[in-house]
Amino acid sequence: VRVLICLGKENEKLRKAFDLDADEFFATGVSIVMHPENPHVPIIHMNIRYFESGNTWWFGGGIDLTPVYIVPEDASYFHQTLKSVCDQYDPSCYFKFKKWADDYFYLAHRKETRGIGGIFFDRLS
């Protein structure tokens, strides 16, 4: 588990890229990366982050699983749980976030997504 808290001055490139109007930023996040020794327990990556600069702010993050041995019922449960959480906010966001994760975590050299996938989102305010 890693916790990040960062305060800093923005440079011109950052201000232009994200259309920011302040000179300073605040960012914080929590990341969990677990590579268990037991091959029956999947690898998990999870990150949630928050960025703020002046009146501009957003959240980003994601979660995905990479099992060594894929159990279809477990994969289905994982995705159904993510969908249930997303549906509380907007029934369309799970499919958008899942595609975003599939694209973001695509392993071009293997021509496949990482593990059984998950969700990814950024710049949500």
Each model region followed by its residue ranges:
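Short helix/loop capping segments that flank catalytic or ligand/cofactor-binding pockets
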Residues: E12, V41-I43, V71-D74
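Beta-strand elements of well-folded, non-transmembrane domains
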Residues: P36, E52, P67-Y69, R123-S125
